[in-house]
């Protein structure tokens, strides 16, 4: 379990004070994958660096597995950091060392005997899918392979928490998915708690159980990924979801001709089993109305499926529209009116 209580990080310069993290409270379940998303400057990198005390909070508490990180002795903090390890956007590999020796490096620092360190490193090479590349140098590896080395190295001391600082930002989409699949596999095999920060909703949707959205140092929205994706509340969250959906339909609305009286354009959001139900056809039949599908999209999250439909209803009375809306609520389908004639 990881808890952040009223965590603040303030930087003082000659001319001003910058509040990078502003009274953040989070609770992260052991064994879960927790995502923190935000645009550049939101404070997410500063936040994650306080988990292992690479940055000390100005105030507030960071508690991991019952240990108050800021209250640990130097030796206690050193030991804790071996259990709260980190992977980085730009890999941070030692270019003069081979794959195997990069992975052995933290074991050497920890004083693990060479034979045991080599055996552990070989096991990790296999775990991350680099068997046969043990003697290669970082300059001979692709970006995805370098990140696999970074992950293996971070796992060398058997951590309980893995921190991922924009770990896929430098990778192409296919390699990103491969690294995300690897993180899922590692979490399942080693029961790790993974905390990752990103500016890509795709990453959050793909592997995270829960998400926190940051803006200007504050957590502005948080909760289970499917719930946040299905029903984003804050403008920033809505923007991330739209970008993931490649949804610019609301912009296109301004180019449409005015709707006739009693016509509607609505967006429906489905989750779980409702994504496979023939809701549109059944409602069309029930209310004897014509429904045009203007846009459709389905996205998979780690814990379920979310579907989106934009519909044009040329005519429906206000009474029937009220019944239509009520039936959607009963079917656990969310509706947003985009335009009304």
From Swiss-Prot:
Protein topology in the membrane: Peripheral membrane protein
Binding-site residues, ATP: 38-45
Reactions catalysed, as given in the entry: L-methionine(out) + ATP + H2O = L-methionine(in) + ADP + phosphate + H(+); D-methionine(out) + ATP + H2O = D-methionine(in) + ADP + phosphate + H(+)
Primary location: membrane
SMART domains, alphabetized: AAA (SM00382), NIL (SM00930)
Top EC class of this enzyme: translocase
Entry-linked CDD domains: ABC_MetN_methionine_transporter (cd03258)
Keyword flag Cytoplasm: no
Family as reported in the entry's similarity comment: Belongs to the ABC transporter superfamily. Methionine importer (TC 3.A.1.24) family.
Protein's UniProt name: Methionine import ATP-binding protein MetN 2
Organism: Staphylococcus aureus (strain Mu50 / ATCC 700699)
Lineage, broadest ranks: Bacteria, Bacillati, Bacillota, Bacilli, Bacillales
């Amino acid at each position: 379990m990881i808890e952040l209580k009223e965590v603040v990080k303030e930087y003082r310069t000659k001319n001003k004070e910058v509040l990078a993290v502003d009274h953040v409270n989070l609770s992260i379940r052991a064994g879960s994958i927790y995502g923190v998303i935000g645009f550049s400057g939101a404070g997410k990198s500063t936040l994650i660096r306080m988990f292992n005390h690479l940055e000390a909070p100005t105030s507030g508490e960071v508690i991991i597995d019952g240990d108050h990180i800021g209250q640990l002795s130097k030796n206690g903090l050193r030991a804790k950091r071996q259990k709260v390890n980190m992977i980085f956007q730009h890999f941070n590999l030692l270019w003069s060392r081979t794959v195997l020796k990069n992975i052995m490096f933290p074991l050497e620092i920890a004083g693990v005997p060479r034979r045991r360190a080599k055996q552990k490193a070989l096991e990790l090479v296999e775990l991350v899918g680099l068997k046969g590349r043990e003697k290669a140098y970082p300059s001979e590896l692709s970006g995805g392979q370098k990140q696999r080395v970074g992950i293996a190295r971070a796992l060398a001391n058997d951590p309980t928490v893995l921190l991922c600082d924009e770990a896929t930002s430098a990778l192409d989409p296919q390699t990103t998915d491969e690294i995300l699949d690897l993180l899922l596999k590692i979490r399942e095999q080693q029961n790790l708690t993974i905390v990752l920060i990103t500016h890509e909703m795709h990453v959050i949707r793909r592997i995270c159980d829960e998400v926190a959205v940051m803006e200007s140092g504050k957590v502005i929205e948080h909760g289970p990924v499917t719930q946040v994706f299905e029903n984003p509340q804050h403008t920033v969250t809505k923007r991330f979801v739209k970008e993931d959906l490649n949804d610019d339909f609301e912009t296109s609305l301004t180019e449409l001709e005015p709707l006739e009286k009693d016509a509607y354009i609505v967006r429906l959001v489905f989750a779980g089993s409702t994504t496979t139900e023939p809701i549109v056809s059944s409602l069309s039949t029930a209310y004897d109305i014509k429904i045009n599908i203007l846009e459709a999209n389905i996205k998979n999250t780690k814990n379920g499926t979310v579907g989106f439909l934009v519909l044009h209803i040329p005519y429906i009375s206000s009474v029937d529209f009220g019944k239509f809306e009520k039936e959607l609520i009963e079917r656990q389908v969310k509706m947003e009116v985009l335009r009304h004639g």
